[in-house]
Amino acid sequence: MSESPDFADFVRCQSSALLRSAWLLTGGDWALAEDLVQTALSEVWKRWERISGMEAPDAYAHKVMVNTFLRWRGRRWTGEIASARIPETGAVAGGFGQVDTRESLRRALRELTARQRAVIMLRYFEDRSEAETAAIMGCSVGTVKSQSAKALARLRHVPGLAEVLTGGSTC
């Protein structure tokens, strides 16, 4: 069965945005993010005739991806191994501040629960409302608010991220 030209165009236009969101959901694991996008797009493709007529098929694809991720978290081992040793997070001389911040963010995202990561990605990366986030995740607005508050509180305690979250200088 060959894919329709419309679906190929959809994938070409949406795959980068889906991959960026998936990277955040997976805590910075590119390989797992690619698997997540591929799985979500295969689900979208199965229903493409119905989905292509929707007002926002990209929103549907994001919803499929988030729900797939939340299902995976219950049964997949991602290779993450907890460590009692806290890594150094101090700035490295030579202009690597952005790399340090990105690495701090990646580690911090892995410390969040899957639901907290999904809320942070939908609310602050994709700039969705609380109601939209709740609809995508299949939960109440109150759950979105509480998960968001808990996640942000955890992220504020990560060295190197406090300045980013509060808008201060990272230098």
Regions found by a protein language model. Give the residues of each.
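Acidic, proline/glycine-rich intrinsically disordered inter-domain spacer in sigma factors
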Residues: 2, 75, 81-110
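A short pre-motif secondary-structure segment
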Residues: 119-123
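DNA-recognition helix of helix-turn-helix
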Residues: 66, 137-161
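Short amphipathic alpha-helical boundary/capping segments
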Residues: 9, 104-113, 155
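C-terminal edge and immediately downstream basic/flexible tail or linker adjoining helix-turn-helix-like DNA-binding
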Residues: 6, 152-171
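Structural recognition of an alpha-helix C-terminal capping motif at a helix-to-coil junction
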Residues: 35-42, 46, 55-67
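Arg/Lys-rich amphipathic alpha helix in sigma70-family domain 2
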Residues: 49-53, 63-84, 97-98
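Short, charged helix-capping/linker segments at alpha-helix termini
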Residues: 1-9, 19-39, 49-55
